[in-house]
Each structure stands twice: as structure tokens, then as C-alpha cells.
Regions:
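Acidic (Asp/Glu-rich) sequence patches and key acidic residues
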Residues: 1-209
């Protein structure tokens, strides 16, 4: 199943949503990664329908989500979508609410890292740290790779089986964007470069403010 990152939290203030969306879009563009913006109607009743079309499951309706979903290479989409209260929420959670199925596990948003490079895992954790400081003060994170808790690359490597396997597969994750050309970088160099990226990004935002 691969290492998974679980996270949950609520926006400090719902009025911060437009700024959060702008920053996430800016970050995705800086990385050369795809993203999707969701802007459901919070005044409309929640509903959804599912059907098999052209061999795939398709869904339509109003799940009551606003925010950004970032799509890194090799990773599941990373949801930064919120409900009307500012609570981070996923499609699964909103669908469970509609279906009147409640479970504490549904309060956690998660992203499986099975096919993502180790650098993507580190990048996501650094992003979550940044968002916790600025937008989600009560953000909780459970990282099965333990990088959030320890900052220990070796531990993360062990959780992901072996770093050699991960780096051998590191072929296209950062061929475009901020980290192009780092195929042969060490794990420590990747961490330093990602941290440097976020420091520069924050400084850039402060200058604009």
C-alpha cells in the first residue's frame, strides 16, 4: 500500500481561503505540477451521483468543497479543500456525510505515497509545516514515514524500503520546475533544496505584503 501521510485541521479563519488558494496555486506552478481548483456552492444542498462511463467511475454533484488539489508526479492528489466551517475535508468525508456514515477516520485527509519519489514526500511534509504556521494552527499530521515527526531522512528511507530503489526510480519527478536536474542528488541535498525553496518562497511572499 505504501507510506501514507494523514492530516486534519481547520482554517484559522475562513476568510483566509482566497489567500490560501492563491499560495497553493503559486506553489504548484513553481513546481511545474498540475492542480485543480474546487469552488462548490456552500448554499446548495450536498448531493452526488456516480456512474460508470467509458469504463471509468465518474461522479457529479455538489460536495460542498472549496480549495485546491495539487497533483505531484507519482503521488495521489493532495487535498487542500475545506467545508463551510474551514475544516479540511475530502471527497470521501463529504460523501460519507451525505450517506450519513460517520467515523472518526473520515476526519483525516490522506495521501498515499506508494509511487511518489522520496523528494515528493519530503516536499509535502515541508508544505504542511508551512501551512500549519500560517493557515492551520491546529493541524495534526500522522506521517507513516515518520518524516513529519522526526525530520529523519534515514527513517523515511527505511519506511520506504530502501533509498536506492527510490532514487533509481527518480527519473521524471522534477524534470520541470524548481528542482529540475536533481536526479543524482543525495537525500540530504534534496532536503536542503526543498527547505531553501520554501524559505525563498516565504521571503518572496513577505516582500509582496
Amino acid at each position: 500500500m505504501g507510506v501514507t501521510i494523514h492530516y486534519r485541521g481547520r482554517l484559522n479563519n475562513i476568510s483566509l481561503l482566497p489567500e490560501l488558494e492563491e499560495e497553493l496555486i503559486d506553489l504548484a506552478k513553481s513546481m511545474g505540477w498540475n492542480y485543480v481548483k474546487f469552488d462548490d456552492d456552500w448554499n446548495e444542498e450536498l448531493h452526488y451521483t456516480q456512474e460508470i462511463k467509458d469504463g471509468s467511475l465518474q461522479m457529479d454533484g455538489n460536495l460542498g468543497l472549496k480549495g485546491i488539489v495539487i497533483i505531484p508526479p507519482g503521488s495521489e492528489p493532495i487535498n487542500f479543500t475545506v467545508d463551510p466551517t474551514g475544516q479540511l475535508s475530502s471527497f470521501f468525508r463529504q460523501m460519507s456525510i451525505i450517506d450519513k456514515v460517520t467515523a472518526e477516520a473520515m476526519d483525516w485527509v490522506f495521501c498515499k505515497m506508494q509511487f511518489a519519489e522520496i523528494s515528493v514526500h519530503i516536499w509535502i511534509v515541508e508544505l504542511l509545516k508551512y501551512l500549519k504556521k500560517k493557515y492551520f494552527h491546529d493541524l495534526e499530521v500522522h506521517d507513516e514515514g515518520e518524516y513529519w515527526e522526526t525530520g529523519n531522512v534515514k527513517t523515511l528511507q527505511e519506511k520506504r524500503e530502501t533509498i536506492n530503489t527510490a532514487m533509481d526510480k527518480f527519473s521524471g519527478a522534477f524534470e520541470s520546475g524548481e528542482f529540475a536536474g536533481q536526479k543524482n542528488a543525495s537525500a540530504e541535498e534534496i532536503v536542503n533544496n526543498i527547505e531553501s525553496f520554501f524559505k525563498k518562497f516565504i521571503q518572496k511572499k513577505k516582500k509582496k505584503e
